[in-house]
Amino acid sequence: DVANIINNDERLKGRLKLVFIPNYSVSLAQLIIPAADISEQISLAGTEASGTSNMKFALNGALTLGTLDGANVEILDNVGEEHIFIFGNTVEQVNALRQKGYNPAEYYQQDEQLNRVIGALVAGKFSPEDPMRYTNLTQNLQYHDYYQSLADFRSYVDAQAKVDEKYKNRDKWIDSTIQNIINMGFFSSDRTIMEYADNIWKVKPLSTNK
């Protein structure tokens, strides 16, 4: 639905296209990951087990736009904050919001841009033939929003602006790309297995001398 709007907008012709690739697989990943400029890792802080896709993207030179969740935290530690785009609440802030009673409507009411986004969904802008298609989504966002998407919205938009700004500066973008590639050695299987052997399994290598 969103693709139909974007891809048929004459203002964006030749500049932007939205494509959904079904049945994502390793074979498709081998084509997509090396070609990516940005890797969006947008899970709510503290909710996702550490995956490896963000590492693969970074190793291939894509810059990460993500929350402080999973391996994003370690990527930040290794590449430095100037070579990654972090947004959203921390785990502590997420938990604090839950404890005091998270009210997504507050964010919806106070942020004009967010209000317009939700309003467009409610009005059926992306599905004029079925205006109620996204009712479950919009009601969940406004009245429940377990993953606190509305709380992170403004920070995400601001981070996207930083992406745009850096992308305009070819030298800075290339520098960040190189920094991501050369600092991904931390995620090597050799280092990981060595740390598991030392800190978890408590094993030592056997001597091969006879």
Name each model-derived stretch.
Residues D1-V26:
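Nucleotide-activated donor-binding/catalytic signature segment of Leloir-type glycosyltransferases, i.e.
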Residues G14-R15, S39-Q41:
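Short, basic, glycine/proline-bearing loop/turn elements
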Residues N23-S27, G46-A49:
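Short acidic loop-to-helix transition motifs that present clustered carboxylates
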Residues Q30:
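An anionic, turn-rich surface loop/hairpin at beta-sheet edges
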Residues I33-A36, I42-T177, I181-F186, R191, ...:
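Catalytic binding pocket for nucleotide-activated donors in carbohydrate/polymer assembly enzymes
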